[in-house]
């Protein structure tokens, strides 16, 4: 009697999904690591899942990393926001980027993170890389006071001109009266 090779059990949908996830995860990891190698600047890349990754970068390398992300298919900014860390007197600025044109990346979001100090809250604008950064950078400037150098139009979106030097999303901002706005005579 000859021995026949043992047949592999059929894969169940969960196993197939796990294999597909590993393939896509490795694809995202591979793309980001290739980008990191080509850049030759210090960045910290963390792939959190098959569709989420975070890149931490010094503000001096922000523009180079953004251009590299653009070159591998991340073609727009979804959101721009900031986090205020008063204990270290820093702001962390976050850009969430994705793709409309690359089907593989369309469901992927990469968060590009960088820090600026209270003493020098300036960053290069990423509007030249992604026009979709336009409104998010304006809002972050208005609400946190972070300047985006090279942005073509850093003017107010929501607040009245009387709010000059007042940044309501900073943790140091306190509302002094009930409600934010005071009725004024017409």
Residue ranges and their predicted role:
Residues 1-186:
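Terminal low-complexity/charged segments
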